[in-house]
Amino acid sequence: MLAFIGGTGLTRMDDLEIRHRHDIETRYGKPSAPVAEGELNGVPVLFLARHGDPHVWLPHQVNYRANMQALKDAGTTAIVAVNAVGGITAPAGALVLPEQIIDYTWGRDSTLFDDPNDPLVHVDFSWPFDPVLR
């Protein structure tokens, strides 16, 4: 199932008909907000407000691991994440689909596989964005 993660400026999707909100507890704690399950133009989707609903979590306070685990537990197979960021040359309001990434997520846990009983997993990060979703 496709999931959307909304960032600052997108704590809700106006056309999403919410059928259920899942309060999910993960081994990493609670996600930023309940996972909303519903339909968007007749397509079943999930939605999670990255900073909470209402917006209460600053970027360094977001429990990213709990967010990802909650979406997985709810049946997510693909994620489209929406972010508000500054730019260098694109005009304000431009939609940008990134091809590569600079990872500035230092200073926080960087894996979902931290239990000694977890499988040994190496993620190929050379092309971090799914070409089908792009």
Where are these regions (language model features)?
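Metabolite-binding pocket within alpha/beta catalytic cores that recognizes anionic/polar moieties
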Residues: 1-127
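Active-site rim beta-loop-alpha module in soluble metabolic enzymes
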Residues: 126-134
